Amino acid sequence: MRTLWILAVLLLGVEGNLVQFELLIMKVAKRSGLLSYSAYGCYCGWGGYGRPQDATDRCCFVHDCCYGKVTDCNPKTASYTYSEENGEIVCGGDDPCKKQVCECDRVAAICFRDNIPSYDNKYIQFPAKNCQEKPEPC
């Protein structure tokens, strides 16, 4: 219960898409994105540099690249719509930019779910000094 309260407090100042991304991760991967992926490896969390450390970190790298291709809206604040059909997340709405953001988040949530076995606690709060290699291109 305390963890849920802390999570709620942390999300109070967050708008739109980041909250939706958290909810999507919880729905698809059955984990809290905030607790599991906000400070993991070289790419999960704010920013990112170097080489992804494992398959989970690569999910964040690909998600960052996906957000980087969004040009007509801010992917961190754009609110989108989605539904669940036959157990799959389907991005909807009429705004192509918001739909693109939803697709970035949907693919990342599936990637997190599919790579849970690669998750390694040694990459939680991973020091930035270990992420100095030249990044690979998106």
UniProtKB/Swiss-Prot annotation:
InterPro entries for this protein: PLipase_A2, PLipase_A2_Asp_AS, PLipase_A2_dom, PLipase_A2_dom_sf, PLipase_A2_His_AS
EC code: 3.1.1.4
EC class of the enzyme, as a word: hydrolase
Active site: 63, 105
Organism listed in the record: Crotalus viridis viridis (Prairie rattlesnake)
List of residues binding Ca(2+): 43, 45, 47, 64
Physiological role: Snake venom phospholipase A2 (PLA2) that shows very low inhibition of ADP-induced platelet aggregation in platelet-rich plasma of human, rabbit and guinea pig. PLA2 catalyzes the calcium-dependent hydrolysis of the 2-acyl groups in 3-sn-phosphoglycerides.
Cellular component terms (Gene Ontology): extracellular region
Signal peptide location: 1-16
Tissue and organ expression note: Expressed by the venom gland.
A Gene Ontology molecular function term of the record: phospholipid binding
Keyword vocabulary terms for this entry: Calcium, Disulfide bond, Hemostasis impairing toxin, Hydrolase, Lipid degradation, Lipid metabolism, Metal-binding, Platelet aggregation inhibiting toxin, Secreted, Signal, Toxin
Family assignment from sequence similarity: Belongs to the phospholipase A2 family. Group II subfamily. D49 sub-subfamily.
Protein name (record): Acidic phospholipase A2 Cvv-E6b
